[in-house]
Amino acid sequence: MREITPRKIIEMKGKEKIAMVTAYDYPSALLADKAGMDIVFVGDSLGMVVYGEPNTLNVSMEQMVFHTRAVAKAVKRALVLADMPFGSYEVSVEEGVKNAMRLIRAGADAVKIEGGYDHKKLVKKLVRMGIPVMGHTGLTPQRYLRLGGYRLMGETEEEIEEILRDAKALEKAGAFAVVLEFVLADVAKLVTEEVSIPTIGIGAGPHVDGQVLVWHDLLGIYENVPPFVKKYADLASIIQLALENYRGEVKEGRFPAKEHYWEFLDKDDFERKKMKALERLEDE
């Protein structure tokens, strides 16, 4: 069992901020775990940042299982959280249970489900089975068509009510935490005060119990990022420069240099072995 558990995350509420980041493969998960992240999240955002999809709707269970397995192999300390992709739980509770079990078998410690009130039965069922669940309300990317695109949530009474209803339903169903995405900070603060489970914000201000960002966004892999993202590095420029330097040295014959390859120390020995090898080939 990994050091960080759902129980540990719950105990951090109001005491210690929760640091969560996405990771989609072995090396990124290894680095995230070494950095001391509390939660390493295999998000369906991989559809956009890894596979180049315009949204998350085309991400499959097979992709989520594949990437979860890679991440789980790398993480020793942090809690590994895996997203339930669009279409994997909406049809029925039974379908949701089956797919959640696939992610747990792949190495996840918990699953995340977008939505709250509408999926309370599934959350309750999973928790009873021993599968920890994190909810997600506010902007829910899997439902961006209904929301009219990616936009700030919580500006109307109805939206505030819906966000609160989702969070409270998740709490009652047994979820151990809830993501609040692209929600006005005042609303996120209200939700955080109204529920006993941790709130993890992404574009939801500072008055939450933790924060989550996408790996590629915070590391500056892509030029365009959501407005709520802080770039902690500009890896795109570093990687681009390294690749250009490599190409240049190959074209100019400067790579590999002497320290990057090996030769026979005894050239006469090489000549003897070369001649014997050539003779054997001629005899075939």
Curated annotation (Swiss-Prot):
Sample GO molecular function, one term: magnesium ion binding
Activity control summary: Neither activated nor inhibited by coenzyme A.
Pfam hit, one: Pantoate_transf
CDD domains reported in the protein's UniProt record: KPHMT-like (cd06557)
EC top class, as a word: transferase
Pathway linked to the protein: Cofactor biosynthesis; coenzyme A biosynthesis
Enzyme Commission designation: 2.1.2.11
Cellular component annotations (GO), alphabetically ordered: cytoplasm
Transmembrane segments: none
InterPro entries (UniProt xref): Pantoate_hydroxy_MeTrfase (IPR003700), Pyrv/PenolPyrv_kinase-like_dom (IPR015813), Pyrv_kinase-like_dom_sf (IPR040442)
Record carries keyword Transferase: yes
Names of required cofactors: Mg(2+)
This protein's UniProt keywords: Coenzyme A biosynthesis, Cytoplasm, Magnesium, Metal-binding, Transferase
Family named by the database record: Belongs to the PanB family.
The name this protein goes by in its record: 3-methyl-2-oxobutanoate hydroxymethyltransferase
Originating organism: Thermococcus kodakarensis (strain ATCC BAA-918 / JCM 12380 / KOD1)
